[in-house]
């Protein structure tokens, strides 16, 4: 199995899990020990305003009227930030040359200053897999994988990310429908 770090996982209709159905996951780590990713197309009820007001900082323009994404059902008490450029942070891992995952508070403070981080997605919680678990789910056709695209990740509204990720594979959502109609 290829390393799926810096890929999107796209849920197929065979994945009937109520949380992950219809999800696009940005894979932040995939190795022999397991995998970690963030759902990037399902909003939480938490407004970005609340994140910045919690640290007494103004909300940057790019985050006004935005919601924190529901990154996954694991560690839902923890925040995760996927951002570009990478930069130097207290708790961060590089995903590729331009994108990193950071879990330390210092990035939120710098996001408020609007001077270091160009683009970012904030999530609560994450998705994680034990060693071999993701590979089994891929064999069961629960997920489609495609190299990630920064435009889809950072620039598209969350509700357009599923369709756009599928389009990278030349697939329209209707092509994945479980049951065809009868004429």
Residue ranges and their predicted role:
Residues 1-123, 127-183:
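A short aromatic-anchored loop/beta-hairpin motif
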């Amino acid at each position: 199995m290829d390393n799926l770090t810096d890929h999107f996982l796209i849920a197929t209709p065979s994945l009937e899990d109520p949380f992950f159905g219809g999800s696009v996951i940005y894979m932040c780590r995939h190795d022999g020990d397991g995998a970690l990713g963030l759902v990037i197309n399902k909003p939480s009820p938490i407004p970005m305003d609340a994140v910045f007001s919690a640290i007494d900082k103004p909300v940057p323009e790019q985050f006004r009227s935005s919601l924190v994404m529901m990154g996954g059902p694991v560690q839902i008490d923890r925040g995760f930030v996927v951002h570009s450029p990478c930069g130097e942070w207290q708790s961060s891992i590089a995903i590729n040359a331009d994108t990193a995952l950071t879990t330390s508070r210092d990035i939120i403070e710098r996001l408020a200053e609007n001077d270091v981080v160009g683009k970012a997605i904030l999530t609560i919680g994450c998705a994680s897999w034990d060693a071999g678990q993701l590979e089994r789910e891929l064999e069961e056709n629960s997920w489609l994988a495609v190299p990630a695209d920064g435009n889809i990740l950072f620039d598209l509204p969350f509700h357009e990310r599923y369709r756009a990720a599928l389009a990278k594979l030349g697939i329209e959502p209707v092509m994945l429908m479980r049951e065809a109609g009868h004429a």
